[in-house]
Amino acid sequence: MNETKTDSTVNPDQSSQELVFFNYHEYLVPGSDDTSLVINHFPNIHTDLSSSTFKETRIIRIPRVYHTVQFPDLIPQFSCYYPGSEPGAITSTQLMSGSFDDNSFNESSSIPSLENIISRSEFENIVSLVNESLAVAFNPMSKRMLLENLLDLLSGGLFLSLLNFLGIYSFTKRKLMELESQIDSINQINEKKGVDFKIISPRVTGYLSLDFQITKPR
């Protein structure tokens, strides 16, 4: 009978390297001259598909991250990297390389028109606001969350039902409502200023990504 031998030793030179962060929503499609276009903005599924808004706007998806807080499966957090500045981003000196699905893309992860719409500091402030609000709202070890859960357990689920009935709501829901109000306020300010930038509530995406609506890149 033949024996199969396996070598479990690992060559030090083949040891795994530290992973580099990138926006996992991006993907490549074939371009011209053997180049690949980086698809980094997407159809605006948050509006009526037959509307002019759908035709004139696109969505940027900021990925969720899992290394910045405890309980990352319970506390949604999003990348603070400006699109195209991620350590694993694809870089290129080309501004525009081609079109795909009637939209303009290039060979890099950056979106050329984005800095004309929102600055890096504004972007980081918005993402930080969302992250901090979600960290407070969903922290399972906060005193208020623990107390509410204990009272709800002892009352057989009546405590939170009573809070909802009285319009007081749970601590988590109140914090999420505050975040919704802040997002609406920022969107209204941008609209008054004529800035083509809108924050989509992370609740709409199930906290899987933080979506921003921008004018369709040309």
From Swiss-Prot:
Subcellular localization, as worded in the UniProt entry: Endoplasmic reticulum membrane
**Predominant localisation class:** endoplasmic reticulum
Q: Provide a GO CC annotation, any one.
A: endoplasmic reticulum palmitoyltransferase complex
Please indicate if the UniProt record lists Membrane as a keyword: yes
One GO BP on record is:
protein targeting to membrane
Q: Name one Pfam family in it.
A: Erf4
Name the domain of life this protein comes from. Eukaryota
UniProt topology in membrane: Peripheral membrane protein
> Which keywords does UniProt give here?
Endoplasmic reticulum, Membrane
Q: What does this protein do?
A: The ERF2-ERF4 complex is a palmitoyltransferase specific for Ras proteins. Palmitoylates RAS2, which is required for its proper plasma membrane localization.
Q: Describe its assembly.
A: Interacts with ERF2.
Q: Family, per the entry? A: Belongs to the ERF4 family.
Q: What is this protein called?
A: Ras modification protein ERF4
